[in-house]
Curated annotation (Swiss-Prot):
This is NADH-ubiquinone oxidoreductase chain 1. It comes from Cnephaeus nilssonii (Northern bat). GO terms for biological process: mitochondrial electron transport, NADH to ubiquinone; mitochondrial respiratory chain complex I assembly. It is a multi-pass membrane protein. Keywords: Electron transport, Membrane, Mitochondrion, Mitochondrion inner membrane, NAD, Respiratory chain, Translocase, Transmembrane, Transmembrane helix, Transport, Ubiquinone. The keyword Electron transport applies. It holds the Pfam family NADHdh. It comes from the Eukaryota.
Amino acid sequence: MYFMNLLTTIIPILLAVAFLTLLERKVLGYMQLRKGPNIVGPYGLLQPIADAIKLFTKEPLQPLTSSHVLFIIAPTLALTLALMMWIPLPMPHPLTNMNLSILFMLALSSLAVYGIMWSGWASNSKYALIGALRAVAQTISYEVTLAIIILSILLMNGSFALSTLITTQEHIWLILPSWPLAMMWFISTLAETNRAPFDLTEGESELVSGFNVEYAGGPSALFFLAEYANIIMMNALTIILFLGAHNNPMFPELYTTNFMIKALVLTTLFLWVRASYPRFRYDQLMHLLWKNFLPLTLVMCMWHVTLPIILAGIPPQT
C-alpha cells in the first residue's frame, strides 16, 4: 500500500518534469519568434517521450580517469533527493505528515549539494570541477537566505509543519504582509535551482556545460530530471508559504486544482525570466546575496520577532 502511495507521487512528478521541458522549449521558441519542437506527435507533444528514449538508450560513457562509483552515485543521489523533497508537501495531504517538515526539506536541499560536488570531482575534469565549485558556493550561499525567510514565515505560522500554513492563510495570503520576503524568496529560488539569470554553473560560454560536462545518456538525463523536479518543487513550496490555496474539506480536489494552476503560473514566470535576462557575473551573484539579501532578511526576521511582542500589550480592537 505504501509502495502505491509512493508511485502515485513519483510518476506524476516525472511526467510533469517531462512536459515542463517541452513547455520550456515551446515558450522560449515563441519568445524568440520560432516554433519550438513540432515534429514528434501532434504539436510536438510526444517530444519528451522521444527525448527520454533517446537518452536512456545511449551508451553511458565514462572517462577512464573518473572515479567510477561516485560517477554513478552522484546523478542517482541528485534525483533521489529531488524526489524525496516532495514527501512533506501538503497538496492538500502530504505523503508523510511530519511535525518538522520544513526542517526535513532544508536538510535535504543541503544534502543535494553533495551530488553536485561529487559529480564535478568524480569526473576528473577541470571544467566539471570549476562548475561544481561554483554550484556548491552558489547553492550554499542562497540556502542561508532561504532558511531565514522560511524562519520569518514560520514565526507568523507558529509551527514547523507545512500543513498548518493552509490554516494560517485562510483569510489572507502571506505574500501581502510579507511582500519583501516573497520577492527575495523568488529570486533566491531562481539561484538555488541554478536557473537563468543565475545559471553560472552551466556557463555555456566558458564552462561548456558545468559540473555535468562529462556525463552522457542516462546519467545526464538523471541530473536533468533532478533540476526540473527541483524547479517544480520550489514553486510548490512558494505557493504553500506565500499563496496558500483555501482548503475546503468537502472538496479536497479543488485545492489541488488551485494549487497546480498557481504552480504552472510560477513555473511560466521562471521561463519568462530565463528568456528575458542575461547571466549575472559571479561576483555580482555573490554581492547580491551577502551584501543585499542577507542584511535585509535578517532585519525582516528581527521585525517578525519583535512585532508580536510590541503588539502584545494592545487590547483587541472591536
